[in-house]
């Protein structure tokens, strides 16, 4: 027969494992979001820079 302590140990390990997976997944989502933010920021800066260059050419 399986003792209560054994069941508690297995439950604790399962819970700990699921928390580790959630932490890793959360970190992954955070990194992906930060990467997208930086990429979007770079695109906006390039668009603004090209717009400024185009307006300078028109003014001349």
Swiss-Prot record:
Q: Which residues cross the membrane?
A: 10-32
Q: Where in the cell is it found?
A: Mitochondrion membrane
Q: How does it sit in the membrane?
A: Single-pass membrane protein
Arranged from A to Z, the UniProt key words for this protein are:
Membrane, Mitochondrion, Transmembrane, Transmembrane helix
Q: Which InterPro entries match?
A: COX14 (IPR029208)
A single GO CC term for this protein reads: mitochondrial membrane
Please state the protein's primary subcellular location.
Answer: mitochondrion
User: Where does the source fall among the domains of life?
Assistant: Eukaryota
Q: Do the record's keywords include Transmembrane helix?
A: yes
- What does the function comment of this entry state? Plays a role in the assembly or stability of the cytochrome c oxidase complex (COX).
In Swiss-Prot or TrEMBL terms, this protein is called Cytochrome c oxidase assembly protein COX14 homolog
Organism of this sequence: Danio rerio (Zebrafish)
């Amino acid at each position: 027969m399986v003792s209560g302590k054994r069941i508690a140990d297995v439950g604790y390990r399962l819970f700990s494992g699921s928390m580790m997976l959630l932490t890793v997944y959360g970190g992954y989502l955070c990194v992906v979001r930060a990467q997208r933010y930086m990429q979007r920021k770079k695109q906006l800066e390039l668009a603004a820079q090209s717009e400024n260059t185009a307006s300078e050419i028109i003014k001349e």
